[in-house]
């Protein structure tokens, strides 16, 4: 469990980025954001390009955010290479990809970050990745399994899902830190969306998808129940993943749940709320 203590005057959360790094820099400038923390709730877009691409992006954020005293915190989604979220690979003063179960302490709040999720389009992405590996193997005259390890630009990672981590939850309990807010990529089973109407085509292609999605939401239920049983007094839970905004303004068990939309390029807009 990593704890990030950051001095700031405000803390915000935004939904899925899907590689919209430059638009986020412009958003920060356009809204004149200063002395703040911005938590990005997964699907950042790490891993689809070569490592050097993200190093360049990080330097751009450092230049802009250091002048404004803004810190961008990113947690992993299902459109991310999990290796970027080890706490070391992307750990700049103002631009950080944090591990699951990290705690952000800022503005008098303790915010627990829980990444991971299942890709509804994983069947298609796996096929595309296998096709890329075949091409690489043929071009470099090597076995397919070796090519799959070496291709730089991947589009799917098998270890994308949410992880229930007893050890990390034990650490949180022993630390005595009260969690005020949870920021995650996906959410518990009783939160929106409550149906799978929008993903029927993916369910037809991927016979194990529905059970895996149900298990994902059940895992979030288990995490919540464990935190509650440990005496945590959580007030707000913010998540992304589902690509629309929802807030029913009625708390569930004393917790206010907010789902954030993804970055909309045609609107040039992030779905951002203050925590």
Predicted regions and their residues:
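A general structural motif
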Residues: 7-8, 33-36, 69, 108, ...
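Structural motif
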Residues: 30-31, 172-174, 227-229
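Short catalytic/ligand-binding loop motif for oxyanion handling, primarily in non-cytosolic enzymes
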Residues: 20-22, 47-49, 81-85, 104-107, ...
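Active-site neighborhood of phospho(di)ester-bond hydrolases with catalytic His/Asp-centered motifs
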Residues: 13-15, 38-43, 71-79, 97-99, ...
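Active-site-proximal loop/helix segment associated with metal-binding centers of metalloenzymes
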Residues: 109-218
């Amino acid at each position: 469990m990593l704890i990030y203590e950051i001095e700031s005057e405000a803390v915000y959360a935004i939904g899925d980025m899907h590689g919209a790094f430059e638009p986020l820099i412009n958003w920060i400038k356009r809204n004149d954001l200063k002395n703040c923390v911005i938590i990005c709730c997964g699907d950042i877009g790490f891993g689809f390009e070569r490592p050097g691409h993200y190093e360049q992006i990080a330097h751009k954020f450092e230049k802009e955010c250091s002048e404004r005293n803004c810190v961008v915190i990113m947690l992993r989604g299902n459109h991310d290479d999990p290796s970027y979220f080890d706490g070391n690979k992307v750990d700049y003063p103002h631009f950080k990809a944090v591990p699951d179960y990290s705690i952000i302490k800022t503005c008098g709040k303790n915010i627990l970050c829980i990444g991971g999720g299942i890709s509804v389009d994983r069947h298609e992405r796996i096929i595309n990745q296998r096709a890329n590996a075949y091409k690489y193997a043929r071009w470099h005259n090597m076995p397919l399994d070796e090519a799959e390890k070496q291709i730089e630009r991947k589009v799917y990672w098998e270890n994308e899902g949410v992880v229930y981590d007893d050890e990390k939850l034990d650490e949180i309990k022993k630390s005595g830190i009260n969690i005020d807010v949870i920021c995650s990529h996906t959410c518990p089973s009783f939160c929106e969306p409550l149906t799978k109407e929008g993903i029927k085509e993916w369910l037809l292609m991927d016979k194990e998808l529905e059970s895996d999605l149900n298990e994902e939401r059940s895992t979030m239920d288990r995490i919540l129940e464990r935190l509650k049983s440990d005496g945590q007094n959580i007030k707000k839970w913010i998540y992304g993943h589902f690509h629309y905004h929802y807030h029913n303004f009625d708390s569930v068990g004393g917790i206010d749940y907010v789902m954030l939309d993804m970055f909309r390029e045609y609107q040039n807009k992030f779905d951002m709320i203050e925590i």
